[in-house]
């Protein structure tokens, strides 16, 4: 269902100059919550941007009626520290510092240099490039340094 929602709202969000990072539908305290995460290629995602996107996609979602039950729409920034789960997440996070945990229990910190539909390339501290297929990744999380 979230894939259908993503397909419906992605073009609208891009027409406003922003990028759709993720869509998730969860249940919190017996209430359905539709979370839409954005990236602003020109800087931060402000409260005004979230409100603008919410006001535009809310009626669109109501008309499409993808979600049968009542729900709360939350529009937010993708966040400074987040788990990368899909090739799209990796592509939208190029150049960021990440913590990588592999299925073979190896872990390292690196800069995400490239990503495609099958793998991601990480620049290690010694500037060597390590290419890893997504199937070999256990968890990848962006790191924000203060």
Curated annotation (Swiss-Prot):
The keyword Glycoprotein does not apply. CDD domains: YlxS_C. Belongs to the RimP family. One of its GO terms (biological process) is translation. The keyword Cytoplasm applies. This is Ribosome maturation factor RimP. PANTHER family: RIBOSOME MATURATION FACTOR RIMP. It comes from Helicobacter pylori (strain Shi470). It is found in: Cytoplasm. Keywords: Cytoplasm, Ribosome biogenesis. Pfam families: DUF150_C, RimP_N. The lineage of its organism: Bacteria, Pseudomonadati, Campylobacterota, Epsilonproteobacteria, Campylobacterales. Required for maturation of 30S ribosomal subunits. It comes from the Bacteria. One of its GO terms (cellular component) is cytosol. The gene is rimP.
